[in-house]
Amino acid sequence: SGTTLKALMNTSKINKDIKGGNKLLENWPKGAGTNETTLKVLLSTFGFQLESVQREAPVLGKIENYTVKLKRPENGRKSNYKHPIAAFGSEAEEKGFRVICLFGKTDASRLIDTFKEVGNAKHTLVLLDYALPLAERRILARKTKTDLSGKIFAVVDRVVLVYLAKHYTETAMNRMLMAVIMPFASYQPYIDKSVDIMPQEIFIGRKYELEKIESPTGINIVYGGRQLGKSALL
């Protein structure tokens, strides 16, 4: 109580990372909401490559609500996402995800009730201007898996914010964000039907073959039997 967010920062880091951590704190929605410009800076500092951030009508008439789309590479290549969460990666290039802002003291049960009211039309990143206690965080981890279905509700609260600001590393930030918030959310990233499109985030292996296909002087015919990964490579 009475301690500012900046006072909790680690001052032993290199200057560039200190600036990045400070930028997270400066653009965090505090009490009275945010706007498109500030949210763009915050999400970019979290490591998202943004195409657009669009303010939508408030959810339930009171909850700040934004639609975020990520940028596709202009050269036709695939984005190099450093985490396996397609909902906040390649899938968001086309479908986007939602950001909502919540303020003030709460608990896991109230959060789950709010998420149900908001609805599961989109995967949702929740910016919560409150520090969830550890016990409530554990309850939230359980309830997101038992009480919610279909879409992600991933919570970034003040605890997550300060942790990421103190350990800010520009090239690893998006991966760190996912590693910290996803254990307390529910998501099944794997594809169990071969007819479904495999997200690039979970395509592992075949690096040599992929490089040969992408090379201007490489191969231009891909062949093989059924279920051997031809479509995944392409």
Can you say where each PLM-predicted feature lies in the sequence?
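Acidic-basic catalytic patches of nuclease active cores, encompassing PD-(D/E)XK
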Residues: 1-83
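Charged, structured surface patches that assemble and position nucleic-acid processing machinery
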Residues: 60-61, 66-70, 76-77, 96-98, ...
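A general structural signal for short secondary-structure junctions and capping/turn motifs
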Residues: 91, 116-119
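Short beta->alpha connector loops
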Residues: 105-108, 132, 216-218
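A short, acidic, amphipathic alpha-helical segment used as a generic capping/interface helix at domain edges
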Residues: 105-117
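Walker A/P-loop-proximal flanking segment of P-loop NTPase domains
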Residues: 175-227, 232-233
